[in-house]
Regions:
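Charge-dense, helix-prone N-terminal extensions
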Residues: 1-105
């Protein structure tokens, strides 16, 4: 769990959204098999990840420059997925206004 993160279903009952102070850092599709999760990353890193792993594709219904969709296959690297979730959270956290970040401590 991440500080000040919460989850909700703002779109429908199959898209679980994770936010920090109202800003999305992950979207998990619950009705897809295998599961899919959209995560934010740096544009250059997104390109690298897509080239290295066929289970990472441009973000579905997202800005494809900044977001990836991770297809959670059984052969997917759980360590990499955890790292990507953490990176997504940190990138969104860093974009929050300073007064929000400092008021959250």
């Amino acid at each position: 769990s991440f500080p000040f993160a919460d989850e909700s279903f703002p779109f429908d009952d199959t898209a679980l959204v994770f936010k920090v102070h109202g800003k999305m850092f992950a979207l998990l599709s619950l009705d897809d098999q295998p599961a899919r999760i959209n995560l934010k990353n740096n544009p250059e890193r997104n390109i690298e990840l897509r080239e290295e792993h066929d289970w990472i594709i441009p973000g579905y219904h997202s800005n494809k420059r900044h977001w990836n969709t991770v297809i959670v296959e059984e052969y997917a690297s759980w360590e990499l997925i955890k790292e990507m979730i953490e990176t997504s959270y940190k990138l969104v956290w860093q974009k929050l206004p300073k007064k929000v970040r400092e008021g959250s401590v």
